[in-house]
């Protein structure tokens, strides 16, 4: 491996996200990572054609795969076939593989919003005024609907969607990790403005909760975001485990936290490249 490994950094700089600036975050990260790596940025639709020229591919704020599902599948297949190093590694069990893991975690009795994907399993869900219906391959709330129990009886998309009870949670909170090392946490105090985040100081129980899902995912390297909600009884429930291209909201943390994250990421990439 050369002293300065080359990275193909995959990002959609122009992707419009409510309350978030994907491009600004990736401009910042690449400006800092250039201290250690030779970098080139590319759009996700160009990654498959370019990836063989670099020591590794770093997938960052590339937007929801739902928008370019076929091209992502071709990129993934080519990377696996050619042994291309992709960061995060393509073995993630969370959102990278679709949201079916929420069914597995529900079945295993883990602290997750109860999730089903078959009409005959609806009675396994807690009673609720409304139920969230989301695509198995969704992201950024794309395709999210809220239906009554009666409306679920007429749902014709079974097999393509997941159903969860709508929970009157206190707030949402996200925990950010590089490899298995916790970096920082952010929360949305107002459930009606979930994109407005503030720094959050987790306690030991919060960290144990978040770390349990990072451990479950078994990724040796990579960036992961554990999204959870604080239930009315005070417990945390997993909303999603984002292990493909989690937005990091680095502009909302203190400078020393942000710099610590950059150094942790650079160290992780060096170890990943061997």
Q: Can you name each region flagged by the protein language model?
A:
Residues 140-232, 236-237:
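Phosphate-binding site of ATP-dependent enzymes
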Residues 12, 62, 120, 136, ...:
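Flexible loop residues that form catalytic
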Residues 73-148:
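A conserved helix-loop-beta module that forms one wall/lid of the active-site cleft
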Residues 46-53, 77, 122-127, 152-155:
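Short amphipathic alpha-helix with an adjacent loop that forms part of the alpha/beta core around
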Residues 230-274:
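C-terminal active-site "lid" helix and adjoining low-complexity regulatory extension at the edge
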Residues 35, 108-111, 216-222:
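Short secondary-structure junctions
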Residues 1-85:
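ATP-binding N-terminal substructure of ATP-dependent carboxylate-amine bond-forming enzymes
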Residues 54-59, 134, 175-177, 184, ...:
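A short beta-strand motif that forms the metal-chelation/ATP-contact edge
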